[in-house]
Amino acid sequence: MANNVVVLGTQWGDEGKGKIVDLLTEDAKYVVRYQGGHNAGHTLVIDGVKTVLHLIPSGILRDNVKCVIGNGVVLSPEALIKEMKPLEERGIPVRERLFISEACPLILPYHVAMDQAREIARGKKAIGTTGRGIGPAYEDKVARRGLRVGDLFDMEAFAEKLKEVMEFHNFQLVNFYKAEAVSYEEVLEQARGYAELLTSMVIDVTDELDAARKRGDKIMFEGAQGTLLDIDHGTYPYVTSSNTTAGGVAAGSGFGPRYLGYILGIAKAYCTRVGAGPFPTELYDGQEKQDPVGKHLGTVGHEFGATTGRLRRTGWFDAVAMRRAIQINSVSGFCLTKLDVLDGLKELKICTGYQMEDGSVLEVSPMAAEAFEKVTPIYETMPGWSENTFGAKSLEDLPQAAINYIKRIEELTGVPVDIISTGPDRNETIVKVHPFES
């Protein structure tokens, strides 16, 4: 039995992780975020009520769950306050159930200013960041000039460090990007309020999680974004700024890697991507590519980013990219989401290989973005189904064509599909194998 479960995306993000984390946390004591920041967008629908979380772990809607933000997360206190307010107005005791590592790097206004100024300067070569300061905050961390949550509790020393780092960033903003400088006095004043807010929630996360493990408590690690956006293993440079893969769990939480159990990979029954970057099976982007099937996927699947509101690009399921994600993460089993979006399509395609210019075939996707320019997807066509799968709760409720589609994905990837999501509500799910019971 796996007491410690990792839930992560195996595509380009937006796979539906939030719903699955919420579903599985019925059996968990802890839910831990270990990377990313408020650039994540996890949408949960419970009894018809929609909640979108960006920073707070998805387990916050479960009364019995402690939610943890690990050291690998870059924390925007401003974003945290905005997210806490509507939850607390609904009677959810966020401050009593949310715990934060003192080692979390802080996202402050100058990070946001830098992020946005850079995207403007890139013009047509823009990466498509969320403009929320994530990348610049990680840069400061690696350069060892970043301010962390723990720094807020010595305000005199914080003020000195802040002045130094803001001189560095404001020089770039004004002289290179021709943007306005960020006010040191305003940022410092905001920080004083942040210290008061965070004091009661800051803990030694490593010690807390290790004690939980020794007690036999069930712990879930909630990934943000997706494997193919990983800073090291994704389609670089069109990636996020953190390690979105299973390897990021230990580094981003301080939890011993030997104790990780089941790795649940979340994948849509088709593919989507937000922003720029390679997408071999793309059908629709709202601009140059206007395939009607791709438009169906985007419209029926409500494919708009929960964080940015941007239209997602859509395409066929890519087993080649999935094999790369499986290698990196040691995926134990899949959760296939949005199966119901495929309802009504006469035929479906799965990418089984990438053909190179020299005629050779890749079975696992390349890493660098440039390499994707030389590939042509090889498709296998399967019959679709006209029946309605929305809200199905057992395999018996699915048409045979849908079952065949799922089985083919299992065959092509070598990994079982243990969970199938057939709608946005936590109850619209088929659970073949429960990760905590595997």
Curated annotation (Swiss-Prot):
GO biological process: 'de novo' AMP biosynthetic process; IMP metabolic process
List of residues binding IMP: D14, E15, G16, K17, N39, A40, G41, H42, T130, R144, Q225, T240, R310
Signal sequence segment: none
Top-level division of the source organism's lineage: Bacteria
Residue positions binding Mg(2+): D14, G41
Single GO molecular function: GTP binding
CDD domains per record: AdSS
Gene3D superfamilies: Adenylosuccinate Synthetase, subunit A, domain 1, Adenylosuccinate Synthetase, subunit A, domain 2, Adenylosuccinate Synthetase, subunit A, domain 3
InterPro entries with a match to the protein in the record: Adenylosuccin_syn_GTP-bd, Adenylosuccin_syn_Lys_AS, Adenylosuccinate_synth_dom1, Adenylosuccinate_synth_dom2, Adenylosuccinate_synth_dom3, Adenylosuccinate_synthetase, P-loop_NTPase
Cofactor note as given: Binds 1 Mg(2+) ion per subunit.
Function noted in UniProt: Plays an important role in the de novo pathway of purine nucleotide biosynthesis. Catalyzes the first committed step in the biosynthesis of AMP from IMP.
Protein name: Adenylosuccinate synthetase
Gene designation per UniProt: purA
